[in-house]
């Protein structure tokens, strides 16, 4: 008679087979994502085709490394290992890597990241910085061996020889290139004497240019203190670095031209033009002054200068005569007023006037004293009355007469309304405070 196996024994045996099978250690699988709902850490979903379904698990560390957003219904290529879960006896694939299926995988990744960054405001015009009109020092983040730096040096030297160019060498493609580009941009921003940055590389495939589509590079350009001009690939190539940069140039030469908007020839032409304008303006001013001088020489004032002050002499004589008449009239008026005052003073008995005013002063003093006494007595009576009223309201005097003050939650209680059994009250008495609990409430008239 054959021995019967337990379910757990069989499951352990199958798990051992799964774990030891080299073909299940690394499985390359294509399937459609199903039952996907993003979770905070590890991700659990299914992969299916038209005939079968397999459960899939992706740990948080691997999921964070994905360069695209996993979506329901997306067809993906995954790499992982197959394992058996003993408690349920089901098998699943532990996904280590994943990418969209088909030749458009990078395009999908590009569009997803572009949408994400756009919604976060990375590409908004309000964040764009202006390119300075005049620069003294330009930083260039690119490969030291490519044609980019040579084209930029040649163009800048031709357009404005005095501008200094500082190269920040970096990898522009391959593993780790994106992180190195981002770090180099941050390093360039530490240079206080730089006016702007040119970030770029020459042409290549989408894979070659992909470092400039990485989120870390976009963030480094966005956070840059310095204005950034991007020059990645050829005119038909567009990367996310181009969207976030303050200006985008199709070629390194175009980037150098954007970095030096005003050339040495422009400045010399401007100076020459200003010199000519100043010269012509000076000539016109001199001619105008000469014409005015000739007209002045021909005027009557210069031919007969004595006529210049004839009118002033006549006006001075008139003013002198008016002053004499005015002083004489005022003196006569003063003398008349003095005579009238003298006559009035002679008709006044000064002693009697003084006696009358003295009597008035005495009466005013008596009236003032009487009024002040009356007002004082009245105010004193009102004060004493108010003082008595205040004293009667003093809580300490109230409790001294045998009364008590009752409060509930620091609020004065004057009626049984709102008081319930079990309430805690504070009773203030002459010599202390009682904390009491209400046992019964009865309403009675006193």
Curated annotation (Swiss-Prot):
Biological process, per Gene Ontology: DNA catabolic process
GO cellular component: cytoplasm; exodeoxyribonuclease VII complex
Xref: CDD domains: ExoVII_LU_OBF
Record keywords: Cytoplasm, Exonuclease, Hydrolase, Nuclease
Residues spanning the membrane: none
Compartment annotation: Cytoplasm
Catalytic activity: Exonucleolytic cleavage in either 5'- to 3'- or 3'- to 5'-direction to yield nucleoside 5'-phosphates
EC number(s) from the headed UniProt entry: 3.1.11.6
Subunit structure: Heterooligomer composed of large and small subunits.
Family: Belongs to the XseA family.
Function: Bidirectionally degrades single-stranded DNA into large acid-insoluble oligonucleotides, which are then degraded further into small acid-soluble oligonucleotides.
Descriptive protein name: Exodeoxyribonuclease 7 large subunit
Gene this chain is encoded by: xseA
């Amino acid at each position: 008679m054959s021995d019967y196996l337990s379910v757990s024994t069989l499951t352990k045996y199958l798990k051992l087979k799964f774990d030891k099978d080299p073909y299940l250690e690394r499985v390359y699988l294509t399937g459609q994502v199903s039952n996907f709902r993003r979770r905070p850490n590890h991700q659990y979903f299914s992969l299916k085709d038209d005939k079968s379904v397999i459960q899939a698990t992706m740990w948080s560390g691997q999921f964070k490394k994905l360069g695209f957003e996993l979506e329901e219904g997306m067809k993906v290529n995954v790499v992982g290992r197959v394992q058996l879960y003993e408690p349920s006896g089901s098998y699943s694939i532990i996904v280590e890597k994943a990418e969209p299926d088909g030749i458009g995988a990078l395009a999908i990744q590009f569009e997803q990241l572009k949408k994400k960054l756009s919604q976060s405001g990375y590409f908004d015009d309000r964040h764009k910085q202006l390119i300075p009109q005049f620069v003294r020092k330009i930083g260039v983040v690119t490969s030291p061996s490519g044609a980019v730096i040579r084209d930029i040096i040649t163009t800048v030297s031709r357009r404005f020889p005095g501008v200094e160019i500082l190269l920040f060498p970096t990898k522009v493609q391959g593993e780790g290139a994106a992180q190195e580009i981002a770090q180099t941009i941050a390093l360039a921003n530490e240079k206080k004497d730089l006016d702007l940055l040119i970030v770029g590389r020459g042409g290549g495939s989408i894979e070659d240019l992909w470092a400039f589509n990485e989120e870390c590079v976009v963030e480094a350009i966005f956070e840059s203190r310095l204005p950034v001009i991007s020059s990645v690939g050829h005119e038909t190539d567009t990367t996310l670095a181009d969207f976030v940069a303050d200006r985008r140039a199709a070629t390194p030469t175009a980037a150098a031209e954007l970095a030096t908007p005003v050339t040495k020839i422009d400045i010399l032409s401007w100076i020459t033009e200003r010199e000519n304008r100043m010269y012509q303006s000076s000539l016109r001013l001199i001619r105008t002054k000469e014409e005015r001088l000739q007209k002045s020489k021909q005027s009557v004032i210069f031919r007969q200068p004595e006529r210049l002050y004839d009118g002033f002499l006549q006006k001075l004589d008139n003013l002198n005569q008016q002053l004499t008449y005015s002083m004489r009239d005022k003196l006569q008026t003063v003398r008349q007023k003095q005579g009238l005052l003298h006559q009035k003073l002679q008709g006044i008995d000064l002693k009697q006037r003084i006696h009358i005013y003295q009597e008035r002063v005495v009466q005013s003093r008596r009236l003032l004293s009487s009024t002040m006494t009356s007002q004082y007595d009245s105010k004193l009576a009102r004060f004493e009355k108010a003082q008595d009223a205040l004293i009667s309201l003093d809580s300490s005097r109230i409790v001294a007469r045998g009364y008590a003050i009752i409060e509930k939650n620091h609020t004065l209680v004057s009626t049984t309304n709102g008081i319930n059994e079990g309430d805690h009250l504070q009773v203030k008495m002459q010599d202390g405070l009682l904390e009491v609990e209400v046992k019964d409430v009865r309403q009675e008239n006193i």
